[in-house]
Amino acid sequence: MPEWQVEEGIGERRALLLDGETPLAAGVHWPGEIQAGDEFEGKLLRKTGARGTAQHPSGREVLVDKLPRDASEGANYLFAITRGAMTERGRFKLPAARPVSTIAGTISDPMANARSVRRFPLGVWEDIWHAASSGEVDFAGGSLLFAVTPAMTLIDIDGDLPPRELSLAAVPQIARWLTLFDLGGSIGIDFPTLQTKSDRKAVDSALEEALSGFSHERTAMNGFGLVQIVARLHGPSLLHRFATSRIGMAARMALRRAAMVEGPGATLLTVHPALRPRLGPEWIAELERRTARPVRIAIDPGLAIEAATAQIVPHDD
C-alpha cells in the first residue's frame, strides 16, 4: 500500500509517496512557509466585495476571497490557507485563503501523517531532484521538456517516433511527473501535431485514463496538438522552486549529501561559490549536530551549482 514518508532535512522537509521503492508523488516544504491547509484566526484588513486581505498571525498578509457580505474590516475571522505564497518571475504572489465556513471538508496536507525516515530509498529523491533541476525527463523514444512561466507550466514533447506513437508514449510519463513534480495550476501540453481527428481522440482517451487519479479539468486536444490542464495549486512545485530559488535548492541538497556520508573524521563539503553565502551558521551547526562531525567548506568555481560534493577527511592535527 502506498505510504507517505518524510525526511526532516536541514532547511526543508522532503516528502515522497512510495509504493515499495517506487515513487508516486513528491513535495517539499520550507520552514516558515504558510502552507495550504493551515487554519488561522486573522484580522480582515481590507475588503472589496467578496475579496480582501487578512493578517496572518506571523504578521504577513494573505489574500482572501469568498468573504460573506457582512464581513467587516478590523474584525477577526477563521481562515484556511488554500494556496501558499508563490514567487514568479518579476512578482510575488501572497498566500491565498478562504473563510473556513465556506470550505467543504478540509484541505488535507498529505505530509501531516507521513512516516519520518532517516533517508529515502537510495537514488529515488536524487532522480526526482535532478529531473526537476534540468526540467527534462527522458523516456523510450522521446523526452518531456518542462518550462515554468508566469502564465502556466509548459510541457513540450520531443522525440524521433512518428507523431501518434510519440504522443501516446509520452502520456504515461506526463501523468507520472505531474505528481512527482507536485505540479498544479495551469499546465499546457504541446503534443506533436496530429493530422487526423482519430489520432487526437486516441491521445485524449489515453490522457483520460492516465490522469484518472489526478484531480483536474482538461481541454480536448486542438488541431495544433495543445492540451490544457487546470489542477488545484497548493504552492510552489519542485519546478517552480528551481525556477525562482535554484541556489536555495542546491544549498539544501548540498547539506543533504553532507548529512548522508558516514565514517569517522570531518565532513568536507565542496560547493560552487554561489552556494557559500546560503550555508549559514545555523545550518552548519545543525549539520554538525546531526553528524557529530566538524564541517569544513571548500569552494570550487569549477563545480556546477547543483554538483556539491561531500566526503569524510581526517581531522586537523
Locate each region found by the language model.
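Conserved glycine-centered short motifs in functionally critical loops
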Residues: 140-316
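Active-site loop/lid in soluble adenylation, ligation, and acyl-transfer enzymes
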Residues: 59
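Active-site phosphate-binding and catalytic loops of NTP-dependent enzymes
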Residues: 86-92, 130-140, 214-217
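Domain-start "cap" segments at the beginnings of catalytic or binding domains
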Residues: 108-113, 118-120, 128-137, 141, ...
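A short, contiguous, amphipathic alpha-helix enriched in charged residues
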Residues: 17-39, 118-133, 162-165, 169, ...
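Charged, low-complexity intrinsically disordered tails
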Residues: 11-27, 39-41, 48-52, 62, ...
